[in-house]
A protein has these predicted regions:
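Short, hydrophobic/charged alpha-helical patches characteristic of ARM/HEAT alpha-solenoid repeats
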Residues: 8, 33-40, 57, 74-82, ...
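Alpha-solenoid helical-repeat scaffold
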Residues: 374, 378-517
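Intrinsic low-complexity tandem-repeat regions in disordered proteins
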Residues: 65, 76, 85, 107, ...
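Short inter-helical turns and helix N-cap capping residues of alpha-solenoid HEAT/ARM repeat scaffolds
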Residues: 12-13, 53-54, 95-96, 137-138, ...
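N-terminal "cap/leader" segments of large eukaryotic alpha-helical scaffolds
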Residues: 1-36, 41, 45-48, 494, ...
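Buried hydrophobic core positions in alpha-solenoid tandem helical repeats
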Residues: 3-9, 45-47, 87-89, 129-131, ...
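Residues that form ligand- and interface-recognition hot spots within folded domains
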Residues: 41, 50, 83, 92, ...
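Alpha-helical solenoid repeat architecture
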Residues: 18-31, 45-48, 59-71, 90, ...
């Protein structure tokens, strides 16, 4: 056999390897092929190809492994079990940029499934190999490395700490300054995954100077980038007053309010979440949001999310806006009044009534309670907005969750304690359970002694008669309030409306002796 014919065998073997690995990589894109390849032992066949002397075969083998591992946690565990990760990590520092992208994809695909798999990636030494990739000239290699780092960090605080200790954050801050939009997105996402866990991790991201570079990107034309930027700023701001102030001092207001009107649903939602995380900390931060026009912007956002709910099928989109309004209103009567003036009651009531998910109804009930609990004027705004009746309905409905019932009861109790709008109180008297009637009657007992017109209206609307009927079946505080209200009327009026009055009259007929001529 001549030398030429021998080489032909080698060439045929190489072509066969290329054909095989490319076919496997292509087949791995279709879910219906995964189980067949797994049963055929694809992992064991691909593993030696990672060390092939032909770079294109190495890259295709890594790509195929990444697609398989990305499909399910079982296949990702198979990658770990076949000891493929150490080979990838070793090659990551040796090979060309194409292989580095493919290898980083495999690490990301394994790490994404669970904390245990992400820990396996860390234990393989992947972070030490990924960090230099963040300094590569090729932006696509940086993207692949940043993406894998974010997927490792997202699971737990310990994993995020490992990522931080590897020195990734300063390099991610440099990456976000690069011109490539995709690299900016992935870097912002990775920093968000790091800082979401603890105040200390968020502080490390802040100390690296990230906020100064994130803040201007709020106005970037790319929607996917704005999603990640708003998310990252919210993850920083949520931990403490100091971190929220760092975000505010980076001049995110009023620009972030414009994101509440963005055409992209996730930009709007993430912006609302960021505002919520800032608003919840102190009255001063809530006031800053209101002074920037935030109350009206949030109210419009909630109303708009309600209108778009049918289109997107995403009721959760309005949740951060509802909660942000509640946090703002909770701090002071002035801030609550700003919400009322911004016409915030109606969209919150609409969410309470129309939203199918109980946790959003519960958030709406809580926010309405924060608005109405301050003064009689605040409570009147909710009473005139027909809120009380709907809170009561949520409280007593058989299908309401425990959380919704609790929040509706607390909100109703807080509003009733300040409510002096008797026309709104009276319908609740008949329809409420005893535990709510108690709060309603307490208000009547406090208000009727000082208002002649209210006393007359209470009689004309049947309230006094209902009280006499109620008096026969209750005791305790309820009985005390009924007696206090009865004391506002002449005894003969009270007697006239008592259930036994007709019997008393009939008894008098029996006792009466007519004058016989």
């Amino acid at each position: 056999m001549s030398g030429v014919s021998v080489l032909q065998h080698f060439e045929a073997y190489q072509k066969a390897r290329v054909t095989f690995v490319q076919a496997v990589a292509e087949a791995a894109t279709r879910p219906q092929n995964i189980e067949v390849m797994q049963n055929a032992g694809v992992m064991q066949l691909l593993r030696p190809l990672l060390l092939d002397n032909v770079p294109s075969i190495q890259q295709s083998a890594a790509l195929a492994l990444g697609r398989l591992a990305n499909y399910s946690d079982d296949l990702a565990e198979a990658v770990v079990g076949n000891e493929i990760l150490p080979q990838l990590v070793y090659s990551l520092s040796e090979q060309n940029r194409f292989y580095k992208k493919a290898a980083a994809f495999v690490l990301r695909a394994v790490a994404k499934h669970s904390p245990d798999l992400a820990q396996a990636v860390v234990d393989s030494g992947a972070l030490d190999a990924l960090v230099p990739c963040l300094e590569e000239f090729d932006p696509t290699v940086k993207e692949a490395a940043a993406w894998a780092i974010g997927y490792i960090a997202q699971h737990t605080a310990d994993l995020a700490q490992n990522v931080l200790d590897a020195g990734t954050v300063p390099l991610l801050v440099l990456c976000i300054q690069e011109p490539e939009i995709t690299l900016k997105r992935i870097s912002a996402s990775a920093m968000s995954d790091i800082c979401k866990h603890t105040p200390e991790l968020a502080q490390a991201v802040v100390d690296a100077g990230a906020v100064a570079y994130l803040s201007p990107l709020i106005m970037h034309p790319d929607s996917k980038l704005k999603r990640q930027v708003c998310c990252c700023l919210g993850q920083i701001a949520k931990h403490s007053v100091d971190l929220a102030e760092v975000v505010v001092e980076a001049e995110v207001f009023p620009n972030i309010l414009k994101c509440l009107r963005d055409s992209d649903l996730y930009v709007r939602k993430n912006a609302a979440t960021c505002i919520r995380e800032i608003a919840k900390h102190t009255p001063e931060l809530a006031k800053l949001i209101v002074n920037s026009g935030g109350a009206a912007a949030l109210v419009d956002y909630v109303a708009d999310a309600q209108a778009r709910n049918q289109d997107f099928g995403m009721g959760n989109a309005k949740l951060p806006g509802i909660m942000a309004v509640g946090y703002i209103a909770a701090f002071s009567e002035t801030l609550a009044l700003a919400v009322i003036v911004s016409k915030g009651v109606a969209p919150l009531k609409d969410a309470l009534v129309a939203e199918p998910e109980d946790h959003i109804k519960a958030a709406s009930a809580w926010s309405l309670g924060q608005i109405g609990r301050h003064t009689p004027d605040h409570a009147r705004a909710l009473a005139e907005g027909d809120v009380l009746r709907h809170l009561l309905a949520c409280m007593v409905h058989d299908d309401s969750s425990d959380d919704l019932r609790t929040k509706s009861k607390r909100a109703l109790k807080a509003i009733l304690a300040k409510c002096t709008h008797l026309q709104a109180l009276q319908p609740l008297l008949r329809d409420s359970p005893v535990k709510v009637q108690k709060y309603v009657l307490r208000q009547f007992a406090q208000l009727l002694p000082h208002d002649v017109e209210a006393r007359r209206a209470f009689v004309q609307n049947g309230g006094l008669q209902f009280l006499q009927e109620l008096n026969e079946t209750v005791g305790g505080k309820l009985e005390e309030y009924i007696h206090a209200i009865n004391g506002c009327y002449p005894p003969e009026i009270v007697e006239y409306y008592s259930p036994n009055y007709s019997k008393v009259l009939l008894d008098k007929i029996d006792e009466f002796q007519p004058m016989v001529a």
